[in-house]
Amino acid sequence: MRAISEPRIRAGVVGAGHMGQYHILAFMELWDVDLVGIVDTDLAKARQVADTYGVRAFADHRELAESVDVATVAVPTELHFPVARDLLERGAHVLVEKPMTPTLEEAKELFRIARLRNRILHVGHVERFNGAVQELRKIVERPILIESRRLGPFAPRVQDDSVVMDLMIHDIDIVLGLVDGEPRKIAAVGSSVNSGRCDVANVQVLFDTGTMATITASRATEEKIRTLAITQPDAYIVLDYTEQDIHIYKRAAQEYTMNRGSIRYRRASFVEHLKVHRDNPLKLEIQHLIGATRRRRAGEPVMPAQQDDLRSLAMALEIERMIRDGVPEVAWRDPC
C-alpha cells in the first residue's frame, strides 16, 4: 500500500461541456486529487463552471498544462489531436475521450509523442471499466455469436460525430476484446435520420475463429437500450451495461417423450444472476489513470493499451467509411 503522505495529483479538465462536467465530478470525488482548473474556449462558461467548484478558469489549455499532472480532453473530436499533443508535450499525462482522433495517423502520432515524453496517454473507453464487463471477461469462452445493441434517442448536442464514433465504438472495443481471434470480414449498413451524419448503423464482423458478431447502434430509438448477448457452447449470457447486470442461462436437462404417435420435447434450464460490484465506470477509469500516474512517477512500468485503442479506432473508421461510400462488405486487414 502506498503511503498516505504521497503528493496529491493535480488534475485539470479541458472542455466544460456535457462530457467535461462528468469528468469534473469524477475528479472531485477522489480524495487524493486536487482539481486545479477547467478550460473552455468560452471563458465565461469556464468561469461559471470553475466558480461552482472553486477552481481556476482558463481559455487556453496550454496555460493549464504547466499547473497539472494529469488532464482530461473532452472537447469536440476534431480538436482532440492538437489539444492532447500540446498537453503531452508540456508534461501532462492525458486522458482523451473517445473517439481518440479523426484519423488513425493522428492517433499513432499521439502515442509516439507520449512515448517520447514518457507520458501516459489513456483513451476514454469507459465501458472497459464497467463492473459487468470486467466480470464478463472472466466467463466468456469460445463465443459462437455476439449480439450488441446500443440504442437511444437523438441528442442534439452530439452532431459532429456519426453514431459509429459516438456510440458504436464502445461495442467494437468490447467485442474485439472478447474474441480470441482476428476479424476477417466486415459488413456494414447505416442511414441518417436526425442529423447530417449516420444515425443508425448495423455491422456484422466475422472472425477467423468462426465467431460472428452483430453490432447495432442507433440514436433514433426512443427507448435507451445497452445490451450485449453472447452465445457460447455451454451458456447464453446477457449483459446490461446500464444496470451493470449479467444473467447466465444454462441447460439443465432435456428429454423426449412419445405418446400415441406424437413426440414431445421438454427442456429445462436454469438462470444464474451474477452479482456485480456496481460503481461509476468513469470514476474507476480516472482512478486507473491516477494509479498509473503514481506508478510512472515511482519509476514502475505502466503498460498502455495502445494496440487495443488503435485497433478499435481503425475498425470504427473503416465502418464509417463503408457506410459513407456505400461499400457493403470488405475483407479486414488490421492497419495497426
Model region roles, listed by residue range:
Residues 59, 96, 121-123, 147-148, ...:
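Hydrophobic residues in well-ordered beta-strands that form the structural core
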Residues 55, 90-92, 117-120, 211:
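A short helix->loop->beta-strand "cap" motif at the edges of active sites that frequently abuts
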Residues 1-53:
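N-terminal Rossmann-like dinucleotide-binding module
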